[in-house]
Regions:
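Radical SAM enzyme [4Fe-4S]-AdoMet core and its adjacent flexible, acidic
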Residues: 18, 84-85, 89, 93-95, ...
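Flexible mid-to-C-terminal extensions adjoining Fe-S/redox cofactors in radical SAM and related proteins
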Residues: 246-338
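Conserved alpha-helical substructure of the radical SAM core
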Residues: 1-88
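Register position in tetratricopeptide repeats
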Residues: 348-349, 382, 416, 450-454
Length: 490
């Protein structure tokens, strides 16, 4: 179809595609590796005459198989072949109303997509729709919903169009518009049979996002970072092996099955190191200080690469958008008591980015306030800003050189910066000054034990939390209200 938003920008059939025997051998290797689910996609998988044979080979070996199609060739006969082969379901790409969908793809594409969904409905095959969202169609979601209900669609996946292939930057939605997608998906939860699904590129960690993910994703965490090369594998038409088919620049190709068995590629030392070895220390920008950085790891790597040319920071995040919307309001505040009150509440709710912003603002208004400096040092630490934590805590010690809490905070910051001897000295000074603080003494003994055992346990060290009586909450909507700051509450 040569779609205007296709991430592949394919013009003609590739000359180096795997042939049928190579594809079937690959199926055996995938099953042997313990793969549980395979999705056939493209391009357009139905352009291969052997697509059903590939699916059947996988199913025979206990692998669940589904497919993503544009629907043009997925007629009643193809649906029957998919069912006979054992496909669990099929997703059809549908990107708007007929006018918009055909403009993005080609005339007649909308009718073929709807016909494919109707054929699946009549045959009793599980169906899904995938909608790639951009400026062209973001406002069309409410108009699409009744049609999808009529076509018996069971799952509706919403994903971002990224500037790769034929997709141009001017049509990519703004980071602030991701919340529109999440809010719409959330509105579907109790409206009928269609299960909304957020693709991995849409997130992360706003309250609505967590509720949507929990409705279909069984896990302790709604999102725990990109799984490319960890539990996911991507295979290109020519047998190139990737962590994710969206991330396919030459430097991300781990090998080719025509030269190397899949198991060898997968288990090779150093394979997929760009993601397997990725850690919170590799983050930057907002993601570096985000409370969810250690588990989220910056969301979808492909979004970061296409939008920032780096894996460090992800602007397309609903939680980030909520927090950053508050920054101008905080910067306008001049009442130190209110800033401190909001900071304490934010710290109690582990919303460290907001606490840090409130305290930085308060510090510009009163730079010699010990309470502000102590809490700001703690907030910097929790935001993984260890040098800032050290600098601010040293300022606090200039005001109160015998303050045990500040010496403890300095010791933690120094340890994170790799200054182990200096960290231990600061901890000992804190212990000498904390004789009447049982909680702080307990924290200090634990941290000194970690320091003496070597730096392997430093990741478990934490400065003592400032005392607060405020309740904790994972509901960000109520949390923002409790703090007294929200996008709708100055």
């Amino acid at each position: 179809m040569r779609c205007r938003h296709c991430g592949s920008a394919c013009t003609y059939k590739a000359s180096d595609e795997l042939d049928t025997q190579e594809a079937l051998d690959l199926c055996d290797q995938l099953a042997g590796l313990g793969i549980e689910l395979v999705t056939l996609s493209g391009g357009e998988p139905l352009l291969r005459d052997d697509w059903h044979l590939i699916g059947a080979r996988l199913v025979e070996q206990g692998v669940k198989v589904n497919m993503i199609s544009n629907g043009w060739l997925f007629d009643a006969d193809a649906v029957n072949r998919a069912l006979e082969a054992g496909f669990s379901n099929c997703a059809v790409s549908l990107d708007g109303t007929e006018e918009v969908h055909d403009a993005l793809r080609r005339t007649g594409a909308f009718k073929h997509a709807c016909s494919a969904l109707r054929a699946m409905q009549q045959a009793g095959m599980g169906s899904a729709v995938i909608t790639t969202l951009m400026q062209d169609n973001l406002d069309l979601l409410p108009r699409m919903h009744p049609l999808l209900e009529d076509l018996g669609v069971q799952h509706w996946q919403l994903q971002l169009g990224m500037p790769m292939g034929s997709m141009t930057m001017d049509r990519v939605i703004a980071p602030s518009q991701v919340e529109t997608i999440v809010s719409f998906a959330h509105s579907l939860l109790n409206r009928g049979p269609i299960q909304p699904v957020l693709a991995d590129c849409v997130g992360y960690y706003s309250h609505h996002y967590q509720e949507i993910r929990a409705s279909y994703f069984v896990s302790d965490l709604p999102w725990n970072g990109c799984n490319a090369g960890k539990s996911n594998i991507g295979i290109l038409h020519n047998g190139d092996i990737l962590g994710c088919t969206s991330i396919r620049a030459p430097e991300f190709v781990e090998g080719n099955i025509r030269q190397t068995p899949l198991r060898v590629i997968w288990n090779r030392p150093g394979a997929f190191a760009w993601n397997r070895d990725f850690s919170v220390e590799d983050l930057g920008g907002f993601c570096e200080k985000c409370r969810y950085g250690e588990i989220c790891r910056g969301g979808c790597h492909n979004v970061k690469l296409t939008m920032t040319r780096s894996l460090r920071d992800n602007p397309y995040c609903t939680y980030r958008a909520q927090v950053e919307a508050l920054v101008p309001k905080i910067h306008q505040m001049r009442d130190i008591d209110k800033l401190l009150d909001r900071a304490r509440k934010a710290l109690a709710l582990d919303m460290y980015e907001i606490a840090e912003t409130c305290l930085e603002r308060a510090n510009t208004l009163s730079s010699d306030n010990l309470d502000i400096l102590q809490m700001l040092g703690y907030a910097h630490y929790q935001c993984r800003q260890y040098q800032k934590s050290r600098d601010i805590t040293e300022q606090a010690l200039m005001i109160a050189p015998n303050d045990a809490y500040s010496w403890h905070g300095l010791g933690n910051a120094l340890a994170k910066l790799g200054h182990i001897i200096e960290a231990e000295q600061a901890m000992l000074r804190a212990r000498d000054r904390a004789t009447n603080d049982e909680r702080l003494m307990c924290d200090l003994e634990n941290d000194l034990r970690i320091l003496k055992s070597g730096d392997r346990g430093i990741g478990g060290m934490r400065p003592s939390r400032p005392l607060t009586d405020n309740p904790r909450s994972n509901n960000h909507s109520s949390a923002f209200r409790h703090i007294g700051l929200s996008p709708d509450n100055p």
